[in-house]
């Protein structure tokens, strides 16, 4: 039987926060079941391992990482231990590689440029034709590719290493 996995976000105005949970249902719309019930943000559920598992993003470990679980919500296991938040991911067709998106620092802060001035926050910009944003941006999303053995990633490579560009 074919199944669909999706997320639902719940919002609390008094608490000024949201929570996302994962649901699974049959493709015909029957048996709609919530499979996560916790305070963590879970999202982007993706079928993998021949449809036997769901991969998803979760911030249970303190940052957004790729996790796996069974279609009934049991057997949760963290698959990545990347030092920052993973914002999106996709497995290669053979399941042996993981492509993921994460923010990388692209501009040195004033404190990085001038360690002798730790309280300085000013920035002088001389190479922009016009101001095109309303805040100073020091990171950009980069695509990373990593080997995946079914349980963990290794050989992580930033495809745009050293570049200030955003992708995707």
Regions found by a protein language model. Give the residues of each.
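Predominantly five- to eight-bladed beta-propeller fold
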Residues: 19-20, 103-149
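Short glycine/acidic-enriched loop and turn motifs that connect beta-strands
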Residues: 10-14, 60-63, 105-108
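Beta-strand-rich domains and repeat architectures in extracellular enzymes and scaffolds
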Residues: 1-20
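Repeat-solenoid scaffold signature
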Residues: 66-100, 104
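Multi-bladed beta-propeller domains
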Residues: 15-17, 25-43, 48, 58, ...
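Short consensus segments that form the blades of beta-propeller domains
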Residues: 11-17, 57-59, 131-137
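Hydrophobic beta-strand positions that form the internal "hydrophobic ladder"
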Residues: 4, 35, 51-55, 79, ...
């Amino acid at each position: 039987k074919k199944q669909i996995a999706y997320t639902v976000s719940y919002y609390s105005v008094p608490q000024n926060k949201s929570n996302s949970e994962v649901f699974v249902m049959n493709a015909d719309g029957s048996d709609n079941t919530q499979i996560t019930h916790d305070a963590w943000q879970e999202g982007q559920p993706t079928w993998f391992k021949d449809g036997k598992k769901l991969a998803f993003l979760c911030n249970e470990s303190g940052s957004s990482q790729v996790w796996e679980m069974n279609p009934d919500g049991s057997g949760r296991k963290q698959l990545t231990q990347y030092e920052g938040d993973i914002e999106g991911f996709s497995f290669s067709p053979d399941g042996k590689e993981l492509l993921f998106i994460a923010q990388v620092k692209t501009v040195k802060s004033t404190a990085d440029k001038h360690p002798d001035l730790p309280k300085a926050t000013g920035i002088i910009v001389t190479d922009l034709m016009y101001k095109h944003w309303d805040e100073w941006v020091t990171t950009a999303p980069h695509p990373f590719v990593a080997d995946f053995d079914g349980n963990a990633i290794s050989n992580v490579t930033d495809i745009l290493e050293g570049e200030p560009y955003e992708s995707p």
